[in-house]
Amino acid sequence: MDGALERFAPLKLETNQLAVTLVDLRDPEQPVQASYRGGEQAYPASVIKLFYLVAIHRWLEDGKLEETAELRRAMRDMIVDSLNGATGYLVDLLTGTTSGPELAPNEMEKWYYQRNAVNRYFASLGYTNINVNRKPWCEGPYGREMQSVRMSKPNHRNWLTTDATARLLNEIVTGKAVSARRSAEMMELLKRDPSPDSGTKNDQAHAYTALALPPGSKLWSKAGWMSECRHDAAYVELPNGSKFVLVTFTVDHANEREIIPAVAKAVVQEFSARK
């Protein structure tokens, strides 16, 4: 991380604007993890959709939701195309809440308790220092969504850490998220084609960790980007057989496309040197 901080010093990349967690999966039964500021909260942008994906599969597995074509379409659009509208629809299904006009105080309390259903699920699994109860907004919250923002600081936004995100992605990769079958279904949605001619430079497969990958690499990922942050949560398989989860969060450098690939490149070089 020192190298990345030094390289991007002219861009005023500060130590508190970068967080990274790396999980070596050479032996999936004995993963080795290292992190830099891995427990620090950051607004996750669309990386939060990874948590909603797992929650949807848990609800389906438990019979809390009916598996419909529309639900499947929304899951696909949330992960593959990162659509906020699809995510909002799934948050409604997960929590039994909807956006809309302001509510009376007692109704708002009930609404907010229901909205925290996903938080309670991840807390039951031992996840800490995260908040997963907000829809990703395009223009901002209104009505009861804004009511809940005002009443719930410091949890007025979604929050994740790179450690928590890496843990979840690792569980998906190793078939431990909900079930092996459901983890495999999640992996299908997260699969990217990092080859140069497979899409535009701005999509999730080409504008983040993928920029550092050598030919022949395989990538599964969920990126997040908005005005104040740029993140990527990636699982990579290199041509030499090395496998790792790499989660990189950057804050206040949303338009700096080179920071995440620079971190990934250092990791790739280290893992590529292995025999």
PLM features per residue range, with description:
Residues 1-40, 266:
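Beta-lactamase-like hydrolase cores
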Residues 1-4, 12-17, 115, 157, ...:
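Structured C-terminal helix/loop/strand segments within mature extracytoplasmic catalytic/sensor domains
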Residues 58-76, 87, 179-183:
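Short, well-structured active-site flanking segments
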Residues 54-62, 92, 167-174, 269:
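Short glycine/serine- and small hydrophobic-enriched flexible loop segments
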Residues 15, 70-150, 158-163:
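Active-site-adjacent helix/loop patches that line small-molecule binding or acyl-intermediate pockets
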Residues 43-65, 78, 246:
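Active-site SXXK
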Residues 26-28, 41-43, 84-86, 96-97, ...:
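Solvent-exposed loop/turn segments at secondary-structure junctions
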Residues 13-18, 31, 37-39, 43-47, ...:
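Extracytoplasmic
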